[in-house]
């Protein structure tokens, strides 16, 4: 008989880079999860914008099981049918001509930054190596991507960091313009800063970045790891803005919970990457590709994408009612089903405490820094699940406010 597993085992056995909740989920269906004790939770965290179709979706399970019954892995000395079908779906649905597959958003961003450096090196020379990123950004945890992310708390302990990376103020085209010049090889930006507080870019800002990149022969990289695959109500957020990048990174929702990432590129950009210039053992794995292909098939429909916009309205309307009652938030912002509630000055820095109260009440939410409660639910979350989950969130807000005033 196997040893019973408890939450305390995490503290005993795991390298402590996470501080997980005190309960352990063991089963999920749709937008509901149950823990070891049988307690039910409505899941508005979505595995941090990953579980785009909820838990244990029957068609994703079928796609995974079908491929699992054939073969699991060969390595990149061989290709496979699943990954080629997935590549064609992404190319047909976006600006891209070529795709590189990997396992995560960080790997996709690493590949994008490496491609940008090589593109500039081959076309213009080694002097053109500068990367412009943005304060409060998040692009992953590799040394290169954590350096591009504009949050020193994630990078300062790992110096010396890769050089020639500078950070402008987000949504400030003048700040970006002061840093972008002929030595810049790339600008990397999130259309919505997710970890940085659910802050949407303005159209003028992204259009201005496109123009600056064109003027200085720099590549424009959109990090759509969190915003991609229907999260905003378009397949990718760049489609909202009418601004097309040279490179786009995608992961999270692309696999619906199965690890997969991708770099999308134009033909011109992709041409500098030749055999041996980059790679990954598991990228394009047939299991991941089979699941991701089904995810795209289910999400890239007018019904699903329009449904995301409708669900956005459900959330915002109910969250504003809750806020009118308890007065916690200055603003409810975001696009589609990436929504942030910004705490007012009286409750600054207490987003984590609210998320903990929410879990006690039976609803899972995220934070984006100390001041923003973040929602990233499944794109197919039902109206009943939204209502039930936000009723529980209202209870959590009531408990939080009453605890603070007691």
Swiss-Prot record:
It catalyses: N(2)-succinyl-L-ornithine + 2-oxoglutarate = N-succinyl-L-glutamate 5-semialdehyde + L-glutamate. Pathway: Amino-acid degradation; L-arginine degradation via AST pathway; L-glutamate and succinate from L-arginine: step 3/5. Gene3D superfamilies: Aspartate Aminotransferase, domain 1, Type I PLP-dependent aspartate aminotransferase-like (Major domain). The modification N6-(pyridoxal phosphate)lysine is found at residue 252. Its cofactor is pyridoxal 5'-phosphate. Pfam families: Aminotran_3. Its EC number is 2.6.1.81. GO terms for biological process: alpha-amino acid biosynthetic process; arginine catabolic process to glutamate; arginine catabolic process to succinate; ornithine catabolic process. One of its GO terms (molecular function) is pyridoxal phosphate binding. Catalyzes the transamination of N(2)-succinylornithine and alpha-ketoglutarate into N(2)-succinylglutamate semialdehyde and glutamate. Can also act as an acetylornithine aminotransferase. This is Succinylornithine transaminase. It comes from Escherichia coli O157:H7.
